[in-house]
Structures are given as C-alpha cells and as structure tokens.
Amino acid sequence: MAPPPPSPPPVSLKVSLLLLRVLTGVFLVIALIILSTNSVTIVSQGSALKFHFKDVYAYRYMLSAAVIGLLYAVIQLFFTISEFATGMKNPFNYQLDFYGDKLISYLVATGSAAGFGVSKDLKDAFIALVALDSTDPVDKFFSRGYASASLLLFSFICLAVLSVFSSLAIAKRN
C-alpha cells in the first residue's frame, strides 16, 4: 500500500517561498544591471584607458553566476506560481528544489565571494600605485563591484533559506 500523499503546506509558507523566489530574482537582476554597466576611464599621462567589468576575470565569474542564478530563479518562479495556483506539486519538483537550490546557492555565494575578494585586492593595488580618494572614478568602479557582490550575497541568503525549506519538504515527502 502506498503511503498517503503529503499534506500541502500552509498558504503562508507558499507565499513565503514565492516571496523568497521573487526577492532572489530581483537581487540578481539588480546585480546584473550594476555589474554589466560598470566601466571606468583612467587617464594617465595624456592617454585614456577604458576599463570594463569584463576585464576582470572575477567580475566575469560574478556575471556568469548571476545569469545562471537568474535563469534558475525564473524557472523556479514559474514552478512555484503553478504550484500555488493548482495546489499540486509535481514529484520531480521536490528533487529539482532540493538539488537546484543547493547548487545554485553555492554558485551565487562563490560569485559573491569572488567579487568581494577582487574588489578589495584591486582597490588596494590602486591605492598603493596612486593616491585614490572617494571621488576618483576608479573608486566608484570598485564600489559598484562591492554593490554587485552584496546583492549576490543577499540572493545567496534567500537561496539558502529556500534550500532549508526544500530539504524539509523532501524529508517530509519520504
């Protein structure tokens, strides 16, 4: 005899999960916008050098992590909305939630860590080479890197909470 199907989660839990998915997507979209528009022109000895986010490998990794995280968040948002509307959850979604939330949360966390690390290291290097103050465009470039990394960190926190809920859901199911 098959075990009875698990009872559906309360509506407040479903709304919380939906809100966390939306917040994850919003944080990732804002991080993508800030990071992808991040550039600076450095004028040195009469020549101008345009410096983009894509010139820093860690920022590229951040961008990749944010894009992959956003794709996952959008897919999960559709599944969450469909579950919310129908009241039924496909058994495959338990596995997708469980493994996907963990994998993507770690990807986003490492993207955030890479952004914080490279922003600090490169900013310290620029301070050592030239007198850098808070009005310098180079400082603003790294501040935008910090902002993007912070937003990735916030999205990681949302994904980590979702990961806990998906772990509990799969434990209840089994």
UniProtKB/Swiss-Prot annotation:
It is found in: Cell membrane. GO terms for cellular component: plasma membrane. Keywords: Cell membrane, Membrane, Transmembrane, Transmembrane helix. The keyword Membrane applies. Its main location: membrane. Residues 1-14, 82-150 are cytoplasmic. Pfam families: CASP_dom. The chain crosses the membrane at residues 15-35, 61-81, 151-171. The keyword Transferase does not apply. It is a multi-pass membrane protein. InterPro entries: CASP_dom. Residues 36-60, 172-174 are extracellular. Homodimer and heterodimers. Belongs to the Casparian strip membrane proteins (CASP) family. PANTHER family: CASP-LIKE PROTEIN 4A4, CASP-LIKE PROTEIN 4D2. This is CASP-like protein 4D2.
